């Protein structure tokens, strides 16, 4: 059976991991074994948090909409329900932007939604 020499392949693999570990502190950026563990953990966290970011932003938008709606005397759930009845199709991101940057326009949306209460 011929001898398998993996010098180039192994070196490339290690260099790739150490390149990904650039910026980590201490041994985590210098020693392959430790760097490999840190890189794997960093990639896991990045994968998880890309999904979590979507949930976090949705929660933030809902909180902002709820706060602005309560100032106008309506709860978030009432607002969303009334908007669906009135066929107002504005997503939560845009509603939150309106609530923060243009309260007058947000008040108009609330007014239109409250007309469809019945």
From Swiss-Prot:
PANTHER family: 39S RIBOSOMAL PROTEIN L20. Binds directly to 23S ribosomal RNA and is necessary for the in vitro assembly process of the 50S ribosomal subunit. It is not involved in the protein synthesizing functions of that subunit. This is Large ribosomal subunit protein bL20. GO terms for biological process: ribosomal large subunit assembly; translation. Keywords: Ribonucleoprotein, Ribosomal protein, RNA-binding, rRNA-binding. HAMAP family: Ribosomal_bL20. It comes from Trichodesmium erythraeum (strain IMS101). Gene3D superfamilies: 6.10.160.10, Ribosomal protein L20. GO terms for cellular component: ribonucleoprotein complex; ribosome. Coiled coil: none annotated. The keyword rRNA-binding applies. One of its GO terms (molecular function) is structural constituent of ribosome. Pfam families: Ribosomal_L20. It comes from the Bacteria.
């Amino acid at each position: 059976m011929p001898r398998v020499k993996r010098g180039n392949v192994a070196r490339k693999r290690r260099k790739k991991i150490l390149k990904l570990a650039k910026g980590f502190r201490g041994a985590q950026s210098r020693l392959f074994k430790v760097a490999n563990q840190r890189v794997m953990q960093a990639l896991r966290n990045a994968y998880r948090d890309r999904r979590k970011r979507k949930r976090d932003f949705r929660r933030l938008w809902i909180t902002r909409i709820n706060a602005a709606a309560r100032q106008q005397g309506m709860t978030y759930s009432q607002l969303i329900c009334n908007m669906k009845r009135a066929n107002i199709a504005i997503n939560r991101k845009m509603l939150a932007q309106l609530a923060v940057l243009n309260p007058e326009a947000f008040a108009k949306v609330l007014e239109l939604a409250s007309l469809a209460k019945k």
